[in-house]
Amino acid sequence: MTYNPRIGGFTHVKQASFDVHVKRGEAQPRTSFAQQIKRIFSKIGETLGQLFRHRAPDSAPGRVRLQGVRYVGSYRPTGDAKQAIRHFVDEAVKQVAHARTPEIRQDAEFGRQVYEATLCAIFSEAKDRFCMDPATRAGNVRPAFIEALGDAARATGLPGADKQGVFTPSGAGTNPLYTEIRLRADTLMGAELAARPEYRELQPYARQQAIDLVANALPAERSNTLVEFRQTVQTLEATYRRAAQDASRDEKGATNAADGA
């Protein structure tokens, strides 16, 4: 069973075989990055499918209503929606860490795939965050930022390709463990809390927790690379945002000067 983000649910898929028969002395080909990401989501989908199936209606935790918000009865409500949502996100992180940390450490191939997927997610999220912000339109800042971001991703050893001189990782997308954390949190808190704006505001926190979870489970070398890449991306964002602000001021100054002439 595999989670399909387009439909927000799980679908049954025929499990593909990744076994490759090779002759002695021949190099065994590496599975494509897309197949690797599919394997991660397949594992997550199987676990969550079991979680949902085993949750019988009569065993669901009781709910209490407080200030118009419905909270899961296993948690003592405070009336602060954001605090309650944070509690459920933290609980989801604990559950995912309990399930995935041993697997990342014991299954070298799965650990590598999660590591590369997390690096790709950091790349994609930074690119989208920067390029979709109207404040970064000024000058030629966006292409320069993407090029610098690609160089930083290349330095980590991620598989990818140059597109018009800019490096792009092969598997850019969402961190699969962040997806699992969010799905578990949705289940824990219920639809009413999950629909509140405070939950959307906490998504950067949930993404950060997913990165920290992976970093804590990885060997030291990969953990350090992950942390350093995240710090590099943050530095690049800050640097190019300042450049965009400067370019915007220059453009406004030139426009005002032309109007006054």
Swiss-Prot record:
Q: How does activity depend on pH?
A: Active in pH ranges of 3.5-10.5.
Q: Where in the cell is it found?
A: Secreted
Effect noted on mutating residue 216 to P: Loss of GEF activity
Chief place where the protein resides: secreted
BP GO terms, sorted: actin cytoskeleton organization
Question: What does altering residue 224 to P do?
Answer: Increased GEF activity
Instruction: Give start-end of the signal peptide.
Output: none
So what does this one do?
A: Activator for both CDC42 and RAC1 by directly interacting with these Rho GTPases and acting as a guanine nucleotide exchange factor (GEF). This activation results in actin cytoskeleton rearrangements and stimulates membrane ruffling, thus promoting bacterial entry into non-phagocytic cells.
> Could you describe the subunit structure of this protein?
Monomer. Interacts with human CDC42.
> Is Secreted included in the keywords of this UniProt record?
yes
In which organism is this protein found? Burkholderia pseudomallei (strain K96243)
Lineage: superkingdom: Bacteria
Q: Which is one Gene Ontology cellular component term of this protein?
A: extracellular region
Homology family: Belongs to the GEF (guanine exchange factor) SopE family.
Q: Name one GO molecular function term.
A: GTPase activator activity
Q: Is Secreted given among the entry's keywords?
A: yes
Output this protein's name: Guanine nucleotide exchange factor BopE
Miscellaneous comment as given in the Swiss-Prot or TrEMBL entry: Immunogenic protein that elicits T-cell-mediated immunity in mice.
Kindly state which keywords UniProt assigns to this record, in alphabetical order. Answer: GTPase activation, Guanine-nucleotide releasing factor, Secreted, Virulence
The record's section on Pfam families has: SopE_GEF
